[in-house]
């Protein structure tokens, strides 16, 4: 009798395992998991955002060795995790030590270590660094399916769609807006082919198109004048920022945004590093506040 019970139990486990089997198309091809992963390591911030959206907790995150790189809204859904280094160069040793049963990697950043990662655990390869808003939502849906939360993710995406529509209704449709990141010697315009640019476009705003095939071109003040947005939103990566120097240039006052005092600084982590459901909602909320001349929430 005991042997029979053990046989039935083993069969039940097999049925449960196959009940959770999922197959998707990732950036490498067909990807299948036979059971729901329990020990997940993510190598991009957007993947942590997606897991948080369905309350799945990763054991490891490539957080650039700084937990505050993760948005507070995302952290609220997670428990303390192990950092596995930077997104650009995650530590294979740290990842292996966690004994993951799923690694979610970025097809742009991690193609070079894909085979090495596969020696540790199954690797779901998705876009993150160079994705658009629509592609990010598709990736979130894939992640939801692979962690056994397909229905929950679909519900969260519907909620997200409704929230974004509410924020969009509070913005003047068709307003020309430009967002860019500013360093000491460089300003990068995020066009509608980038994640942030496409989030703003989804809100009904008029975002610059790609320039000469470049989705995130480095431009000068004269080129910015040619774009001439009604609103200019800037994420300053450095304290010494080229845009701050431009503001002392006589040409600056020729910008419509400058003339109307519609130049705003935004959090670089939220607007440029993070991508995902929570991140898009924060950007939408920030944009409404900016357009209505309200102070932004300080990110901690």
Curated annotation (Swiss-Prot):
Leader sequence segment: 1-21
Principal subcellular localisation of the protein: periplasm
Coiled coil residues, start to end: none
Keyword Transport: yes
Alphabetic keyword roster: Ion transport, Iron, Iron transport, Periplasm, Signal, Transport
Phenotype when changing residue 222 to C: Retains 32% of wild-type citrate-mediated Fe(3+) transport
Cited Pfam families: Peripla_BP_2
UniProt-reported outcome of changing residue 93 to A: Retains 10% of wild-type citrate-mediated Fe(3+) transport
Domain Fe/B12 periplasmic-binding: 39-295
Induction / repression: Induced 1.8-fold by hydroxyurea.
GO CC annotation, single: ATP-binding cassette (ABC) transporter complex, substrate-binding subunit-containing
Effect caused by changing residue 93 to C: Retains 17% of wild-type citrate-mediated Fe(3+) transport
Subcellular location: Periplasm
Listed result of changing residue 222 to A: Retains 26% of wild-type citrate-mediated Fe(3+) transport
Effect on the protein of changing residue 248 to C: Retains 92% of wild-type citrate-mediated Fe(3+) transport
Effect noted on mutating residue 68 to C: No change in citrate-mediated Fe(3+) transport
InterPro entries assigned to the protein according to its UniProt record, in alphabetical order: ABC_transptr_periplasmic_BD (IPR002491), Bact_iron-sidero_bind (IPR051313)
Superkingdom per UniProt: Bacteria
Subunit (UniProt): The complex is composed of two ATP-binding proteins (FecE), two transmembrane proteins (FecC and FecD) and a solute-binding protein (FecB). Interacts with FecC and FecD.
Function: Part of the ABC transporter complex FecBCDE involved in citrate-dependent Fe(3+) uptake. Binds both iron-free and iron-loaded citrate although it binds iron-loaded citrate with a higher affinity. Binds different forms of Fe(3+)-citrate as well as citrate complexed with various representative Fe(3+)-mimics (Ga(3+), Al(3+), Sc(3+) and In(3+)) and a representative divalent metal ion (Mg(2+)). Can also bind various tricarboxylates in iron-free and iron-loaded form.
Membership in a protein family: Belongs to the bacterial solute-binding protein 8 family.
Protein name per the record: Fe(3+) dicitrate-binding periplasmic protein FecB
Gene giving rise to this polypeptide: fecB
